[in-house]
């Protein structure tokens, strides 16, 4: 239920808002036009089913990451002399060593955790849904891949955004009382526009901001396909795969997507945080209840790896009933090797 309400309803409008803002800033595209076109294109994909989602999202994900990292490298090269100061500022601010920001350390930590979890989805349980269809001989393999994805998302992609913003100097910092401690971005709303205007200030012309707008569309498009996959999976579980339920979540999801251009940024963030919190609380409780079993599965994986074997999983060894038969082949392989 939390998976349906989070990715399917409360968390998706914010991303459409980001697309509309960067497209308006780069090309002057009206918000309603951006929202309508994005919703229609996404609707074509999600109505094509889960297989179409997988075939489209993989190449787009690779392309968008490459584009974004190339832009970041360009900013870093052009501002190489500023990089030591940028990283010093990051660490000083993080640990309250920068006098200007010391008073808002708690707020900084709070916002960092909220936005970080929103980005990498750590602890929400959504990663398990996304990787469940993969074919692997041992669940620990896929678990390690998911850990790597969180690392890449947080320490590579999110850090790239930080480098662009801090190197360009285009940002505001708000104090605990709402006043601006640092005001270098004027009235520009916080978020993706800091990155876009930061790029425009580093590279000549507005081409980099336009490239970012296109990359953002790709980022959000693939992300929303993932959101829909999670929501549909939850709906299928609740209603045993009934077609009416699937079409209902499609309609609700696409309506929520379009609502992003009709609502204010603050309200969308509040809705998104609610969805993230809803998923995380339920999932973290489940993680704590299953931690002993997970540890045993990881030990099994490591023991087989140390022997030079390709780890195979037998759910019966851990008291797990495999009603689908998904692990039968690997369980048999493990028994034959014993």
Q: PLM features: residue spans?
A:
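Select transmembrane alpha-helical segments in multipass membrane proteins
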Residues: 1-7, 36-37, 99-119, 156-159, ...
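Helix-loop-helix module between adjacent transmembrane segments
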Residues: 1-46, 215-224
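Membrane-water interface regions at transmembrane-helix termini and the short interhelical loops
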Residues: 20-25, 38-60, 236-237, 263-271
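Selective recognition of specific alpha-helical transmembrane segments in multi-pass small-molecule
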Residues: 36-50, 61-81, 115-117, 140-169, ...
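Helix-loop-helix hairpins and the membrane-proximal interhelical loops
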Residues: 52-113
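Extracellular/periplasmic helix-exit of transmembrane alpha-helices
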Residues: 72-89, 103, 133-134, 148-191
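Juxtamembrane helix-boundary/capping and inter-helix hinge elements in multi-pass membrane proteins
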Residues: 122, 132-144, 152, 237-244
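Terminal cytosolic tails of multi-pass membrane transporters
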Residues: 277, 284-338
